[in-house]
Design a protein with these regions (language model features):
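Conserved N-terminal substructure of TIR/SEFIR domains
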Residues: 1-59, 78-86, 92-95, 118-136
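Short amphipathic alpha-helical segments
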Residues: 1-3, 108-111
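Active-site-adjacent loop/helix micro-motif of nuclease/hydrolase catalytic cores
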Residues: 65-71
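Glycine-rich, charge-decorated loop segments at or immediately adjacent to ligand/cofactor-binding or catalytic sites
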Residues: 95-108
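Short acidic-hydrophobic, aromatic-tinged amphipathic segments that line or gate anion-handling sites
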Residues: 112-117
Length: 136
């Protein structure tokens, strides 16, 4: 299964960890930090990746919620039958910086993974991978 990771550019270090964890269990990950090269048309690359992907992990941080790109990617996934049951919102960071109430209502109705509930980052990343494997 090809997985698109939607995130704010400020969260790239965590994105790399998530991508590595998903690839470790055999999932194919599309990540803008690796796939978009200097000179590439950013919008075209994102559009193509969204069309080719079968699942989306949305890393929800304060910066991601302010990002028009992340909002657009979420709207795309919500409108596509292929992403049904395969849109995974992930709350990242301090709950005081991003209370669940700040997450758009449409994402709150989905099962959300809260990284703050795991003692180790790796445990949360493993949970993301498990949910995706079950949805495959």
């Amino acid at each position: 299964m090809k997985v698109f990771i939607s995130h704010a550019y400020t969260d790239e270090s965590f994105v790399r960890k998530v991508a590595a964890g998903l690839e470790k269990v055999g999932l194919e990950v599309w990540d803008a930090t690796r796939e978009i090269l200097p000179g590439d048309n950013w919008a075209d690359k994102i559009s193509q990746a969204l069309q080719e992907s079968e699942a989306m992990v949305v890393l929800l941080t304060p910066d991601a919620l302010r990002s028009s790109s992340v909002r657009w990617e979420i709207e795309y996934a919500l409108g596509q039958q292929g992403y049904r049951e395969r849109l995974i919102p992930v709350l990242v960071g301090n709950p005081e910086e991003l209370p669940k109430e700040d997450v758009p209502w449409i994402l709150r109705r989905l099962h959300m993974i809260d990284m703050g509930e795991y003692a180790e980052e790796e445990e949360g990343i493993n949970q993301i991978a498990q949910v995706l494997l079950e949805a495959a």
